[in-house]
Swiss-Prot record:
Pfam family, one: Prefoldin_2
Alphabetically ordered keywords of this record: Chaperone, Cytoplasm
Known role: Molecular chaperone capable of stabilizing a range of proteins. Seems to fulfill an ATP-independent, HSP70-like function in archaeal de novo protein folding.
Subcellular localization, as worded in the UniProt entry: Cytoplasm
Cellular component aspect of the GO annotation: cytoplasm; prefoldin complex
Alphabetical list of PANTHER family matching this protein: PREFOLDIN SUBUNIT 1, PREFOLDIN SUBUNIT 1-RELATED
Annotated InterPro entries: PFD_beta-like, PfdB, Prefoldin
Gene Ontology molecular-function annotations: protein folding chaperone; unfolded protein binding
UniProt protein name: Prefoldin subunit beta
Length: 117
């Protein structure tokens, strides 16, 4: 087996780093997506309640009473924040994927035997 040039070893190390970053971003995306789905479901449930319904929310380890209007406002803000975060993570994932693809091509080109011309 031939030795891998130091330059290619460095690129392989960078590729591994990108792949770890990608895994982290994917995990974060899954968490944000789950939180977003939960917030949207809660929003639907509260919107379906009558205006005079008693609404409670959790604050740390406590459950406190709030108004439907205030709960709706807080949930809408939460959904908006989570959507922004999810979009940012999608862009980050796309950029890392592009870097992985580009670096993989460079590694393959560096390891390809020279062609006789």
């Amino acid at each position: 087996m031939q030795n891998i040039p130091p330059q290619v070893q460095a690129m392989l190390g960078q590729l591994e780093s990108y792949q770890q970053q990608l895994q982290l971003v994917i995990q974060q995306k899954q968490k944000v997506q789950a939180d977003l789905n939960e917030a949207k479901k809660a929003l639907e449930e509260i919107e379906a309640l009558p205006d005079d319904a008693q609404v409670y929310k959790t604050v740390g380890t406590l459950i406190v009473k709030t108004t439907k209007e205030k709960a709706l406002q807080e949930l809408k803000e939460k959904v908006e924040t989570l959507e922004v975060r999810l979009n940012a993570l999608n862009r980050q994932e796309q950029k890392i994927n592009e870097k992985v693809k580009e670096l993989t091509q460079k590694i393959q080109a560096a390891l390809r035997p020279p062609t006789a011309g």
